[in-house]
Amino acid sequence: MISTSSFSCAGRKGANQDSFLIEQLNNERFLLAIADGMGGEDGGQIASHLAINSLKNDFISNPLLNLNTAFENVQKTFIEKVALEPQLKKMGTTLTACIINKDTVNLAHVGDTRIYHLRGNGIISRTKDQSELQQLLDEKIITKARAKNYPRKNILLSVMSAYREFKLQALSFEIMNGDRLLFLTDGAYSLISKRDIRDYSITNKQISGLVGKIRSHIESKEIRDDYTVVGCELNIS
């Protein structure tokens, strides 16, 4: 079983373009997902909701579906939506999802939402930002120090949309009793460091306490973008 805690709040724009999902598929399988929409006016909000609802409906119909197929179906849903409403052709969204089955996690990721994996005193990133900035860092064209002020840090190289091919990061890994996974949109992780998250995890015995502390930390900063955090902890009896 897992225990979960979450929040999702609008930034300065008013309408929250983030969406998330926590769904128990059967006694041992759980689906968690997070999306950060984009596309102007209502496009971003529609895109993230559309992606999350597509995942939910697919896995409710078939709990044993694989994430690769589910992500392909999300894009088909976008294509169908834009065919009916061409004004939404620029909408897109990040999408990051996990299937937790006992002690195994299957992950699929597109965009720059993140999953952090916490165990004891450690924290690692399970996703890699599919952004122009991350590519420049990988190619050592820009340093981490310069990256903080890079003006195009929000430019994504892969998103879920009707017209662009997406690049799927997929992986599987094992988790242990007490491990925690945190899903964060960029509006959240841009305002809190991995070190602070790790420290809060060490001092909060419940996942709800950790997520609450992260929210308090974020809301003490100057908020610009929508911010969403989904946390879960594996509890093996």
PLM regions and their residue ranges:
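PP2C/PPM-type serine/threonine phosphatase catalytic domain
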Residues: 1-237
